[in-house]
A protein has these predicted regions:
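N-terminal targeting or signal-anchor segments and their processing/structural boundaries
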Residues: 1-264
Length: 264
């Protein structure tokens, strides 16, 4: 799902989040100065009344707020994709995403870090291709696939081709742990939580200093002409809530080359 954000004149902003996205920063943002997070408040109501659809009046009575305050709370949750708010009926319908977000907070289910911020000038943030139903996403500087493993993507020209089931393609740079890669036609598989990298122009990596293993140095000679696969974490561990020390795993699919005669 995605939502637009107002920006300066001629600038267009949009935020696109996975339905399984979770972050502690967003949790704190939703809570603000309240003593109890509004997500918990809504869940307390649905637990008490055993229903996911209710009116503003019913909710206001339960939380002991006036109807204007209750409506503002519900509308904010609707803007963030946790409920559907029907203004003509003054009725809220709770989405599964609200319950999943609470479970993610308590580490009871897996979640992901897929969140894209699009900022464009003179072009659309998102374009739907009606022939294949893929989304062309523009104006994306960087985004994160894994906070724990520090896997960050910087797409070339800010462009991503989003496909079914949160799979996507891009050209650009990949930072993964101690590796940095630059490639073309990179393919992300959401279910496998991996990147297929058929055309990697170069790979640089960091190693521990022999005299001080707390510090790193980049190997100056890049490995070139790679075809490889990056497995970010186990498919059922996208949040890295289980500590699996072997990830991320980078596997070369063919012979590669190191050119020692390059001066740069």
């Amino acid at each position: 799902e995605f939502r637009a954000i107002k920006g300066p004149k001629r600038d267009a902003f949009a935020v696109i989040e996975s339905n399984n996205y979770f972050s502690d920063d967003k949790w704190r943002e939703l809570q603000g100065i309240e003593s109890v997070n509004p997500l918990y408040v809504v869940k307390q109501f649905t637990d008490a009344y055993k229903k996911d659809e209710f009116t503003v009046k019913q909710f206001a009575k339960f939380v002991k707020l006036d109807e204007v305050q209750a409506k503002m709370m519900l509308m904010n949750l609707a803007l963030n994709g946790f409920i559907i708010y029907e203004s003509y009926r003054e009725t809220a319908i709770v989405k599964q995403k609200l319950y999943d977000y609470i479970l993610s907070k308590t580490k009871k289910i897996d979640y992901d870090a897929l969140r894209f911020i699009s900022a464009t000038k003179g072009e659309a943030n998102i374009v739907l291709n009606t022939s294949d139903m893929n989304l062309q996403m523009n104006g994306i500087k960087t985004f994160t696939l894994s906070d724990t493993h520090n896997v960050v993507i910087r797409p070339k020209n800010g462009a991503i081709r989003m496909q079914k089931n949160r799979n996507f393609e891009f050209d650009g740079d990949i930072m993964a742990g101690l590796f940095t890669l630059s490639g073309m036609n990179c393919k992300f598989s959401y279910d496998n939580f991996s990147l297929e990298l058929p055309t990697v122009d170069s790979l640089n990596f960091f190693v521990h200093l022999f005299e001080d293993t707390t510090k790193f140095v980049m190997i100056q000679t890049p490995i070139q002409n790679l075809q490889c696969k990056l497995i970010i974490d186990a498919p059922d561990n996208k949040s890295s809530r289980k500590k699996l020390p072997d990830y991320p795993i980078l596997s070369s699919m063919k012979d590669s080359y190191v050119y020692y005669d390059q001066t740069n």
